[in-house]
Amino acid sequence: MLSKFLIGLSFNGKVVKGKGIGKSIGWPTANLEIDGRKFLPGEGVYASWTTIENSNKKIESVMNLGSQPTINPLLPSAVEVHLINKDIDLYGLNLSVEPVEKLRSQIKFKNINQLSNQIKKDKDNALKIFKNYKK
C-alpha cells in the first residue's frame, strides 16, 4: 500500500560513478548525487519509479537509501537505484526517483551472497507491488 507519507514525494539527482560493487554482484545501481537539503524518506529499501531526464516513462526500480552496512558501515549514506530489467548507461544523466513503498529497513548481512539473495527478494517484492499501481 502506498504510504501516505510517500504520496507525491520525488527527488532528483545526477548519476555519479560509484565503486561498481552492485554491478559486480549482478545488481547494477545508479548512484545519485542528491542536494543535502532535499527531504528524503527514512533509510531503507524502497520500491520506486525512476524517470530518466527528458523522458516521461516511469521505470520500475528498487532504491536503497542510507548506509551500506554489509559493504562498509563507515561509508556515508547514499541513494542508489537499480532499474528492474533495464541495462542503460546512466552516467551523467539526471534521474527523478519516486518512492512507492518501503520494502525493508537496512540490514547488515554476513556476506555479499546473502546481500545479493536479499536484493533478488527485494526486486520480486517490488514487482508484486507495482502490479497494484498505475504508473
Pin down the residues of each PLM region.
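Phosphate/ribose-recognition catalytic cores of enzymes acting on nucleotide-derived substrates
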Residues: 4-135
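Contiguous mid-protein beta-loop-alpha structural module that forms a pocket-lining wall or clamp
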Residues: 1
